[in-house]
Amino acid sequence: MTAEATVETRGFETEAKQLLHLMIHSLYSNKEIFLRELVSNASDAADKLRFEALKQPELLEQDSELKITIDFDKEAKTLSITDNGIGMNRDEVIANLGTIARSGTAQFMANLSGDQKKDSQLIGQFGVGFYSAFIVADKVEVLTRRAGSEPSEGVRWVSEGEAEYSIENIEKAARGTTIILHLKKDQEEFADGWRLRSIIKKYSDHISLPVEMPKEAAPGEDKEEKAEVEYEVINTAKALWARSRSDVTDEEYKEFYKHVSHDYTDPLSWSHNRVEGKLDYTSLIYIPSKAPFDMYNREKPRGVKLYVQRTFIMDDAEQFLPLYLRFIKGVVDSNDLSLNVSREILQQDPNIDSMRSALTKRVLDMLEKMAKKEPEKYATFWKEFGEVLKEGPAEDFANKEKIAKLLRFATTHKNTNEQDQSLDAYIERMKEGQDKIYYVVAENFNTAKNSPHLEVFRKKGIEVLLLSNRIDDWLMGHLMEYDGKQFQDVGKGSLDLGKLDSEEDKKEQEKVEEAMAPFVERMKAALAEQVEEVRITHRLTESPACLVVGEHDMGAQMRRLLEAAGQAVPESKPIIEINPTHPLVQKLDQEQDEDRFKDLSHILFDQASLAEGGSLKDPAAYVSRLNKLLLELSN
């Protein structure tokens, strides 16, 4: 069979063209990273071949010594990176090189700000990979053949990084991939041996595969006399996680993080640990400093890289960490698992549960240590990943208390939107006799801060957590207590401040309730269709009325979220609490006209609904009643 000679020209998609152009210009200030990306890809290709060759040894084609080779030609101004890894067939070339656009691209494009520094970090999270070659090259050639295919099934892909690329079949004896960069006029430094060596040592020394380059001629040695090029390995070529911690520098740890995560920023923290005993494994886990743009997509691939006895098995092994820690990057290398391990086997292996439990505890311990010793760094973590960590109490019962210790909240202590108060700090400031942790949930921070439910708490100097994120109501549904203190939603059920109310206060409340009983019955009749109950409040000191939900009913904020998502919500009516000391209520109590009493009661109910961020079921009726009242007042 001979190679197909036809050259096919194909166009990049519009979105892909924009992204390619943006990448080239946004990353120009840090252009040498292109080599790190290409070497990293070559290493991944070798890992994939090793894995597939476990079941199909013939894929190695009598060439089991996997390596990466870098060549350059100063005169031709070219640089080539060659690996003898898995390679690609024609369809894979089109899928991997011809299409940048993929799931999440539109969201990624929408997040771009025009700020070059910020955008370059975002581009790094998206995964530049191969396309970074166009930062320094005005033309890129890819010659590749998939392991196990015929030499005639080689593929040549060529592009100048503009609107299109060409692809054709070629004869290629060796499996694997060669990328040839035709360097731009002002990028000739990347055809210099010493410059390339320094970049490899800086960014890719940790690559477990040997990276080789032509040996530099010794001083006085004539290059022309050599019959063939001699190569030498220029990196350490040992898996970084397999080295002793004392032998690895911080810079090496940071560069390895960028290799496994394809991130451009340094990690916040990392932990390198060897476990021996019943289970034998090494882990190197990282906490990133920036959240990926698609972090809230719970379906996207996640997890650590899994190796067995230094042999790559899979990317995104999600079985080793729970979903709420999906932002963690790193490597797990086990000596106990089978080389033929699959995702299905991982789900059934009890040893994986033990490793998952230990790794989860390690991450939570890292965060606890950071929060205690480096609060500023933890504040950075919380801003990026706090909302995801809030998923933890619902997913991880065993570590609920540890996760709760890491949560941060806005509270009435500072009255700002900054989520920087821990539950431990709240408990330290609790009033004498206080046995609950109080919180309010609202649609946004201002609604929470100004909630009428807080009035008695402000009067008594009791701190309240101000919760206003979409996940908060759901979080508190799974976080019943912390450090022996129960959580209490100040907008739910009856308010009992326990020892924080004096006996005199309680007796006074009983007397008022008895005196206002006829008024309560009258209002209950007026609002029978809208409310479950009318009662005298202990919460309000300034507002005339507020709405609360039953102790076991769904919170108002959760109800609004579910309704907005089009989900069925169980029917329930709120409770209206009336402040008997407010002039409006006292005036209403004296109203003799029952129709007017009913109208004013409805206005009071609707205003209470608006005050807590709710919406009116019948806005037109509210406006009509209000206009009627205003007209009466003006007359």
Swiss-Prot record:
Q: Name one Pfam family in it.
A: HATPase_c_3
Keyword Nucleotide-binding tagged: yes
| Statement: the UniProt record of this protein carries the keyword Nucleotide-binding | yes
Q: Which domain of life is it from?
A: Bacteria
What subcellular compartments does it reside in? Answer: Cytoplasm
Q: What is its main location?
A: cytoplasm
Which portions of the sequence form the region B? 344-560
Q: Which InterPro entries match?
A: HATPase_C_sf, Heat_shock_protein_90_CS, HSP90_C, Hsp90_fam, Hsp90_N, Ribosomal_Su5_D2-typ_SF
Which stretches of sequence are listed as region C? 561-635
Gene3D superfamilies hit by this protein = 3.30.230.80, 3.40.50.11260, Heat shock protein 90, C-terminal domain, Histidine kinase-like ATPase, C-terminal domain
Q: Which GO terms describe its cellular component?
A: cytoplasm
Q: Name one GO molecular function term.
A: ATP hydrolysis activity
Q: Which UniProt keywords apply?
A: ATP-binding, Chaperone, Cytoplasm, Nucleotide-binding, Stress response
Location of region: A: 1-343
Stated family? Belongs to the heat shock protein 90 family.
By its UniProt entry, which PANTHER family does this protein fall under? Answer: HEAT SHOCK PROTEIN 90 FAMILY MEMBER
What interactions and quaternary structure are annotated?
Answer: Homodimer.
Protein purpose:
Molecular chaperone. Has ATPase activity.
- Name the record gives this protein: Chaperone protein HtpG
